[in-house]
Regions:
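ABC family nucleotide-binding domain
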Residues: 1-202
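Serine/proline-rich low-complexity intrinsically disordered segments, especially terminal tails, linkers
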Residues: 15, 30-32, 220, 258, ...
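Conserved beta-strand-loop-alpha-helix hinge in the C-terminal portion
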Residues: 206-234, 243
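Long, low-complexity, intrinsically disordered segments
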Residues: 257-286
C-alpha cells in the first residue's frame, strides 16, 4: 500500500513582532493547531526553522528546548490542564518550581497574580471546586506567573460560555498589554480574532490571508504606556518554510524527527529575499 503525502502546513512563512497579539484562525483540520505546536516546540519540524528572539528552535536538543520553554514561553490550554490534586495556588506555583525559585518567593508571586485575575479568595480551592471560568483564570495565572516573553493560547475559551469568554479574553489581552508580552492564539471563532493585531487565516494547511487589525478589541485594557509600545521593530517569532512529515501505516500516525533548515525564503524551488510574511510548509504522509 503506497503512501500519500498530506501537507498539514504547506508553504507557510511569517513573522510575529515583539508585543504583538497574533491570532491563527481556521476551522477544525485546517492545520492551525499543528502550526501552534511547531511554533511552541511541542512538535518537531521536518524542514524549515522557527526563530524566537534570535534562537533557532530547530537547532535545540530536548534539554535545551525544555529550558528555553521554561524561560521564555507560557501556555493556556482549552482543557485548563490543571492538576486536580493541587490547589489553585499550587498549580500556579508549578512553573516557578521548575525555575527553582525559593518557596517563599514563588508563593508570593503566585498569590500576587491570582489576585490580579480575581481569584484572591480561591487560592486554596482545587479545580473541582471551581467553575470553568475560574479554572481558566488559574490557567492564565499559571501561564503569566513566570513572566514569559510569549504566551501560546490554544482555543482558550473553547469550554466557556459567551459571557465568560469575554471575561477571559479581556483578561488575556489586558495582562499582555500591561506586561508588553507577545500572544499567539489559535481559534476557530472569528469573534475572538477581533482582539488580535494580526490575524493569520489558515485553511488546508495554507495561509489564505494575513489581516492587520488597526482597531483591535481591548486596546484600552492596558496602560497607555504599554499600549503605545506593544509593537516593536525587533521580530520575535519568525517561521521559515516549515515542514513536518508524519507517516501512517494502517491509519496509525507517528511523528518524524528528521528535519532540515531551509534558507530559501521564497516559493519552493525559488530563491527569494527575506521578508516578514511568506509561504510556509508542514507535511504529513499517509
Amino acid at each position: 500500500m503506497g503512501q500519500e503525502k498530506i501537507r498539514a502546513v504547506d508553504g507557510v512563512s511569517f513573522t510575529i513582532e515583539e508585543g504583538e497579539f497574533c491570532c491563527i484562525l481556521g476551522t477544525s483540520g485546517s492545520g492551525k493547531s499543528t502550526l501552534l505546536n511547531l511554533l511552541a516546540g511541542i512538535e518537531k519540524l521536518t524542514a524549515g526553522d522557527i526563530i524566537i528572539n534570535g534562537s533557532s528552535i530547530k537547532k535545540m536538543n530536548e534539554k535545551k528546548l525544555s529550558k528555553f520553554r521554561q524561560e521564555n514561553l507560557g501556555f493556556v490550554f482549552q482543557a485548563y490542564n490543571l492538576l486536580g490534586s493541587m490547589t489553585a495556588l499550587e498549580n500556579v506555583e508549578l512553573p516557578l518550581v521548575f525555575k527553582r525559585l525559593a518557596p517563599g518567593k514563588r508563593k508570593r508571586m503566585a498569590r500576587s497574580i491570582l489576585k490580579k485575575v480575581g481569584l484572591g479568595d480561591r487560592m486554596d480551592h482545587k479545580p473541582k471546586e471551581m467553575s470553568g471560568g475560574q479554572q481558566q483564570r488559574v490557567g492564565i495565572a499559571r501561564a503569566f506567573v513566570a513572566k514569559p516573553k510569549i504566551v501560546f493560547a490554544d482555543e482558550p475559551t473553547g469550554n466557556l460560555d459567551s459571557r465568560t469568554t469575554i471575561e477571559v479574553m479581556e483578561l488575556i489581552k489586558g495582562m499582555a498589554l500591561k506586561n508588553k508580552l507577545t500572544i499567539v492564539m489559535v481559534t476557530h471563532d472569528i469573534s475572538l480574532s477581533k482582539y488580535a493585531d494580526k490575524i493569520i487565516h489558515v485553511s488546508d494547511g495554507k495561509i489564505t490571508e494575513i489581516e492587520y487589525n488597526e482597531n483591535p478589541l481591548g486596546a484600552d485594557l492596558g496602560t497607555a504606556e504599554a499600549a503605545d509600545n506593544t509593537k516593536a521593530d525587533k521580530p520575535e517569532v519568525t517561521a521559515k518554510n516549515l515542514k513536518k512529515a508524519k507517516e501512517t501505516d494502517n491509519n496509525t500516525v507517528t511523528g518524524s524527527d528528521k528535519g532540515e533548515i531551509k534558507t530559501n525564503m521564497g516559493e519552493p524551488g525559488k530563491q527569494g529575499d527575506p521578508v516578514k510574511i511568506k509561504e510556509t510548509s508542514n507535511e504529513e504522509s499517509k
